[in-house]
């Protein structure tokens, strides 16, 4: 609700807004609920970025995602590779929303002389993470699969993908 966001920002007068909020999930969730991922992420971003502008917030940090880069992106990834190829189909709706947030920050900064920056964090994991095998991110799901294989004394492990993508991880 953009009006509530604006009223909240007007009341507390933040010097900096840090946007880490997003609907997130793994391959299965991103594939099955694309409409939710694009709609909810655009709503979150639009409300927070524009609400910050209306409340005269000068500094904003927007967290992007490595999924904004092309599916066949050269490794290691560089900022210049953004929009240089086709996105991964399984999470293109989420990626498009994140790209829109990046462009909003860029253009608010350009047009209004604000310090609205976009940062691309690595894949984060840790306490309180989602370890559900059906809708978690890659690394928490992998950790859970390894744990379950160990507990059940399995000799093999089912891991999706080719194994070629490189990932940065941070605990």
Task: Give the residues covered by each predicted segment.
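N-terminal Rossmann-like NAD(P)+-binding domain of SDR-like oxidoreductases, especially those catalyzing
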Residues: 1-130
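Arginine residue identity/basic-tract feature
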Residues: 10-11, 23, 153-155, 167
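Short leucine-rich amphipathic alpha-helices used at interfaces
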Residues: 31, 151-152
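Substrate-positioning beta->alpha
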Residues: 93-96, 104, 117-118, 130-145, ...
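Short helix-terminating capping/connector loops at secondary-structure junctions
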Residues: 113-114, 152-154
């Amino acid at each position: 609700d953009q009006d509530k966001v604006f009223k909240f920002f007007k009341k507390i007068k933040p010097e900096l807004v840090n946007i880490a909020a997003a609907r997130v999930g793994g391959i299965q969730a991103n594939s099955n609920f694309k409409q939710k991922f694009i709609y909810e992420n655009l709503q979150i971003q639009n409300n927070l970025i524009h609400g910050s502008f209306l409340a005269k917030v000068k500094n904003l940090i927007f967290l992007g995602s490595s999924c904004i880069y092309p599916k066949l992106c050269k490794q290691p990834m560089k900022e210049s590779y953004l929009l240089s190829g086709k996105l991964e189909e399984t999470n293109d709706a989420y990626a498009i929303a994140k790209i829109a947030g990046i462009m909003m920050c860029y253009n608010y900064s350009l047009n209004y002389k604000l310090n609205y920056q976009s940062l691309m964090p690595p894949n984060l994991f840790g306490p309180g993470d989602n370890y559900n095998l059906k809708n978690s991110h890659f690394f928490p799901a992998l950790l859970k699969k390894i744990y379950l294989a160990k507990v059940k004394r399995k000799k093999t492990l089912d891991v999706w993908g080719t194994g070629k993508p490189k990932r940065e991880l941070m605990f």
